[in-house]
Amino acid sequence: SVGANSIRLAHYQHDQYFYDLCDEKGIVAWAEIPYITVHMEGGRENTISQMKELIAQNYNHASIICWAISNEISLQGVTEDLLENHRILNDLIHRMDKSRVSAMANLFMLETDSSLVSLPDIRGYNLYYGWYVGEMEDNDTFFDQFHKEHPDTVIGLTEYGADSVIS
């Protein structure tokens, strides 16, 4: 247990000032490229370029613990081209930065045994129990079942629904 606050800098690269604040305040940060919702064949070079830039520009920020490959990318299904692009990005992360891990935020409807979700070092799930589906307590059930099936896998809650906020 690190005992630190964390933030997911989701969906796009953020201003250097914010990364500086995370370093200064000791906030653990998840950095992510804007590879979201739908995989576009022919967009591979763009995603590679964006990942290279994200890592090169932010490598020296101590607050960053992971480089995230994508967010909810499986909305239109998992294709071989999508898988190959994720393999390339995952390998690129590990070549450019051997001190940090790769991560990905997965759509809550994606099966936990999908070949896509096992690629990065950290699996994040955007769960909307208590908003789109089910009850808020279903978050507990999901994570308990996942941990039982995958006790050595690093997992996190990367998004949750506005109506499921505990007040």
Range-by-range predicted roles:
Residues G3:
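Phosphate-binding active sites in nucleotide-utilizing proteins
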Residues S6-S167:
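Substrate-binding/catalytic cleft of secreted carbohydrate-active enzymes
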